[in-house]
From Swiss-Prot:
It comes from Human papillomavirus 52. It holds the Pfam family E6. Belongs to the papillomaviridae E6 protein family. GO terms for molecular function: DNA binding; PDZ domain binding; zinc ion binding. It is found in: Host cytoplasm; Host nucleus. A motif (PDZ-binding domain) lies at residues 146-148. GO terms for cellular component: host cell cytoplasm; host cell nucleus. This is Protein E6. The gene is E6. InterPro entries: E6, E6_sf. Plays a major role in the induction and maintenance of cellular transformation. Acts mainly as an oncoprotein by stimulating the destruction of many host cell key regulatory proteins. E6 associates with host UBE3A/E6-AP ubiquitin-protein ligase, and inactivates tumor suppressors TP53 and TP73 by targeting them to the 26S proteasome for degradation. In turn, DNA damage and chromosomal instabilities increase and lead to cell proliferation and cancer development. Forms homodimers. Interacts with ubiquitin-protein ligase UBE3A/E6-AP and thus forms a complex with human TP53. Interacts with human NFX1 and MAGI3. Interacts with human IRF3; this interaction inhibits the establishment of antiviral state. Interacts with human TYK2; this interaction inhibits JAK-STAT activation by interferon alpha. Interacts with host DLG1; this interaction leads to the proteasomal degradation of DLG1.
Length: 148
């Protein structure tokens, strides 16, 4: 389908433009399990701002289950260290608003309010493979407290 790597669309929006289809019509398969993405998974892929990957010149996305699984595997294999928000700003020499931070579970880019929530709750951001992660509001849940 897309033989020249230089002209391949990288985002779902670009792919839709090239194929002259809307986001509501486009069909993608998961790069891992090869199942067709459900409509809500296509929308989530778009919202998450992930990149299209190619196998045998065909475009692929990733389903929600595989994305969560791959995120967990990446966390286990490639975790480097964690920092509090203030320390992260000092280390990177940028304010949190300019640092790209994705959710450690669903890979959604964190909005400024979600980053601020980490700071206010005194939670750390994690460096995994050189990329910063935290938790989005959808995946945020407090750790269970054990009672003695």
């Amino acid at each position: 389908m897309f033989e020249d790597p230089a002209t391949r669309p990288r985002t779902l929006h670009e792919l839709c433009e090239v194929l002259e289809e809307s986001v509501h019509e486009i069909r993608l398969q998961c790069v891992q399990c090869k199942k067709e993405l459900q409509r809500r998974e296509v929308y989530k892929f778009l919202f998450t701002d992930l990149r299209i990957v190619y196998r045998d010149n065909n475009p692929y996305g990733v389903c929600i289950m595989c994305l969560r699984f791959l995120s967990k595997i990446s966390e286990y294999r490639h975790y480097q260290y964690s920092l509090y928000g203030k320390t992260l700003e000092e280390r990177v020499k940028k304010p949190l608003s300019e640092i790209t931070i994705r959710c450690i579970i669903c890979q959604t880019p964190l909005c400024p309010e979600e980053k601020e929530r980490h700071v206010n709750a005194n939670k750390r951001f994690h460096n995994i493979m050189g990329r910063w992660t935290g938790r989005c509001s959808e995946c945020w849940r407090p750790r269970p407290v054990t009672q003695v």
